[in-house]
Amino acid sequence: MAERGGDGGEGERFNPGELRMAQQQALRFRGPAPPPNAVMRGPPPLMRPPPPFGMMRGPPPPPRPPFGRPPFDPNMPPMPPPGGIPPPMGPPHLQRPPFMPPPMGAMPPPPGMMFPPGMPPGTAPGAPALPPTEEIWVENKTPDGKVYYYNARTRESAWTKPDGVKVIQQSELTPMLAAQAQVQAQAQAQAQAQAQAQAQAQAQAQAQAQAQAQAQAQAQAQAQAQAQAQAQAQAQAQAQAQAQAQAQAQAQVQAQAVGAPTPTTSSPAPAVSTSTPTSTPSSTTATTTTATSVAQTVSTPTTQDQTPSSAVSVATPTVSVSAPAPTATPVQTVPQPHPQTLPPAVPHSVPQPAAAIPAFPPVMVPPFRVPLPGMPIPLPGVAMMQIVSCPYVKTVATTKTGVLPGMAPPIVPMIHPQVAIAASPATLAGATAVSEWTEYKTADGKTYYYNNRTLESTWEKPQELKEKEKLDEKIKEPIKEASEEPLPMETEEEDPKEEPVKEIKEEPKEEEMTEEEKAAQKAKPVATTPIPGTPWCVVWTGDERVFFYNPTTRLSMWDRPDDLIGRADVDKIIQEPPHKKGLEDMKKLRHPAPTMLSIQKWQFSMSAIKEEQELMEEMNEDEPIKAKKRKRDDNKDIDSEKEAAMEAEIKAARERAIVPLEARMKQFKDMLLERGVSAFSTWEKELHKIVFDPRYLLLNPKERKQVFDQYVKTRAEEERREKKNKIMQAKEDFKKMMEEAKFNPRATFSEFAAKHAKDSRFKAIEKMKDREALFNEFVAAARKKEKEDSKTRGEKIKSDFFELLSNHHLDSQSRWSKVKDKVESDPRYKAVDSSSMREDLFKQYIEKIAKNLDSEKEKELERQARIEASLREREREVQKARSEQTKEIDREREQHKREEAIQNFKALLSDMVRSSDVSWSDTRRTLRKDHRWESGSLLEREEKEKLFNEHIEALTKKKREHFRQLLDETSAITLTSTWKEVKKIIKEDPRCIKFSSSDRKKQREFEEYIRDKYITAKADFRTLLKETKFITYRSKKLIQESDQHLKDVEKILQNDKRYLVLDCVPEERRKLIVAYVDDLDRRGPPPPPTASEPTRRSTK
């Protein structure tokens, strides 16, 4: 095999064995040797994705000559793809994660074994299939009559009709599939007939070959005496070829042993045989060249005596002569230790017959299988499968979750666990679920870990495995393994007694499951089968009921849909449930003898039961007889309660049929409210409050749960609101109690609590911490209020005293001793406590008066300063406005003078310059002599020259207009007239003389005039054609049929002057008409008058 490089740093190269094989082929073939096939570089070994289940390699093909088609053998099984070729890169969800080795030995298959809905596998042989090259959509209707479309192959659905594909009705699909099935059956019959014919032809060919072999043997017997010398050389060549073939066989056997795991089945030792086919026509010498083939043959045993074997056969070229010798002589047989492995890699392409597409195993999704929403891909029945990829059969059972080992568990469990996987004692003791991590080793022995669910690989041991190892170390069970061989995986029904101790303790919870929950558990779907040719599927539930499901419209029906009525295949599908068939297969495959796993489970369960019995005996030593009797009585009570509950449920079911659902739901909600069912609890915890109420049976189990969920949603908010209001009301009552107590703000909480501990309002606050917080808050508010009241009272006394002093009109020179005598009888004076405070307030009042006087003076000075500043600012603004106004007047005056100078200079030019042929330099000398020249002194030299040029251009334009007016008035001028002809007519006219003295300039102006007139005439003629309604898009066809239509058009146009102007150029006029007609024909019919986009016209 070619060595695979890393990231592309090394080129592709062949090993010596491949080069030697290519050289041998070049020597043995007469024509040019086939080139060695370039080995395609695949991904690195650890990055290579696992092959899909349908591409698993099987037994290698039988030996045959290279590059030649083998004879047909009807007993030969279908050939798999040639070995050595890496599987194709699959989609991302089928690719192996980094550092994950390919599946070998007993490793679990990768998750890619289950095809996703987006990539349906091929159909089984013989099943009617749609045309592979044609995309077909089927039109169907929903129960309410709405039309939708779905792809018959990919199951994709849409409300709108797809474009560019074939669309058929639902009623047309079934006949088409039936016709295809008939065609396939005919093709299979023809293929079988051809196979029989080929087998007969092969038998005849073998008989002929035997006859030829006998004739050759006789000829060889006659010629062997003459070829003894050549026989010695032949023996030497055979010995060399044999040694070389043995070396190649050993190299390839070693490569196979390294690249594939060794199966556990035994096989006879392979052999290396050398056969020498000879062929000699008459008595002449002929050389027969054969190819050396090294192949591993695996024969399928047809009887009990036949066993698979592998052999390495080497054929060498020989030169045969006449001699009495057998046809084929076995030279040597060398036994080799050769394990049964996958077929070796083929370094060159070998044509092989196409392998038949096998039916998909039970794990894969058959055609038209679309999983139900929220349900995983269902495994049929017990979900067992046989992987027949080598000469041995391996039975793989599923885990408790209903999936194969190594596969990701389903998102929503759909199938009840019906099989048990062989587990270690540690798993039986502590683990309640299969671990997601698996341990693997690389080629160099390094350990890594792979997660079957997340497809993640890591070098470090996960925490889950570490905890599992710790649990294994704690558990020490005296269980010895009877054999070192791996235990086969069994399919056993689950037994609660075989579960670990932890699960045994949880059994009472399982016994508490009500009849409604058990019925709901049984009503879950367990299997599904699609109906060919329709979007419907048949679904079986755990209670043996059948309903129909449409994954396209997400519609489920208990009754059979209209398009499935009267179909025999649907009746057959319903009569043969796949899960029951899987149970029967499981019973057939199940081994009757007890295994090591069953013995271990029995020992563990017996030891656990024994421990529990000992514990119960120790606890109930005093009353063993009473306990047993009580247990019997309890069992009887439980049975009687169950019977009574079943009778009540049956009676309630009859009553439910009478009372409307809304009334029953309302009564059920009232019961929940009356019984005080908490909105923050679960259905199981609150069930004991309502289960004995007669209204409990008004609804079935499903409706009870739904109403309870609605009640919880609405009642939760109400309870929160009530709880909040209750807490707020308790706080308000507590505050009122503190206000009524009128305690000293300096009191402590302990004193307050001791005094009011028996008050109901005190007890309404549950936590002492909350009571203390409310008390501290109230005390802080009281203290703050007291402080604010004291401050306010002091401010009022002060303001009243100041008012008293202000009434006596005091000034800064007043004395307290004199003022005191005047105000001491006033109550506002007496309100101040001490005389020192009164004197201090008096001094504050005098200082305030003095400050007020000073502040008034300062305010007056500031007011005067502001007035003066505003006057100065106003004066500056007036001066600025005056200066701007003066400047504007000066600018206007200058502009007026400048305009006056321009007018004077233009008047000067009008009087002095009459000819347009003069220059500025000559005219300037003449203008200087005029007195008006000085009036234009304000103009610059460039401005005067610019005005002169404008004056000259005006004169030239005026003369040109007069000249063209002269040409227009000359009726003899046509579009084809020349200057020589026109010159004779207009040369005496003053306008022609004044235009220019240069005849060349006149001719140039005349030619420009004719050109402009010609362009204008053509434009006017096109406008005339558009205005002529007689010319339409049909005119071209009419003109092609007869020239009369064109003559009619010209006759109509002759009445217009725009047509007559072009009389001098009739050919050009005819071209314009034809071009317009072609344009109308190209545009086609005109759009209707209401069209909003006239540009969208149909073009031919």
UniProtKB/Swiss-Prot annotation:
The modification Asymmetric dimethylarginine is found at residues 28, 30, 41, 48. Residues 32-90 have a biased composition (Pro residues). The modification Phosphoserine is found at residues 640, 836, 935. Keywords: Coiled coil, Isopeptide bond, Methylation, Nucleus, Phosphoprotein, Repeat, Repressor, Transcription, Transcription regulation, Ubl conjugation. Residues 1-15, 461-483, 498-508, 632-642 have a biased composition (Basic and acidic residues). A motif (Nuclear localization signal) lies at residues 628-632. Signal peptide: none annotated. One of its GO terms (biological process) is DNA-templated transcription. Residues 131-164, 431-464, 530-563 form the WW domain. GO terms for cellular component: nucleoplasm. It comes from the Eukaryota. Residues 1-90, 258-332, 461-528, 616-642, 872-897, 1078-1100 are annotated as: Disordered. GO terms for molecular function: DNA-binding transcription factor activity; proline-rich region binding; RNA polymerase binding. Residues 184-254, 607-657, 846-908 form a coiled coil. Residues 661-714, 727-781, 793-848, 898-954, 956-1012, 1014-1079 form the FF domain. There is a cross-link at residues 505, 509, 610 (Glycyl lysine isopeptide (Lys-Gly) (interchain with G-Cter in SUMO2)). The keyword Transcription applies. Pfam families: FF, WW, WW_TCERG1. InterPro entries: FF_domain, FF_domain_sf, TCRG1-like, WW_dom, WW_dom_sf. The FF domains preferentially binds peptides with the consensus sequence [DE](2-5)-[FWY]-[DE](2-5) and mediate interaction with HTATSF1 and probably bind the phosphorylated C-terminus of the largest subunit of RNA polymerase II. Binds RNA polymerase II, HD and SF1. Binds formin. Interacts (via the second WW domain) with TREX1 (via proline-rich region). Transcription factor that binds RNA polymerase II and inhibits the elongation of transcripts from target promoters. Regulates transcription elongation in a TATA box-dependent manner. This is Transcription elongation regulator 1. It comes from Mus musculus (Mouse).
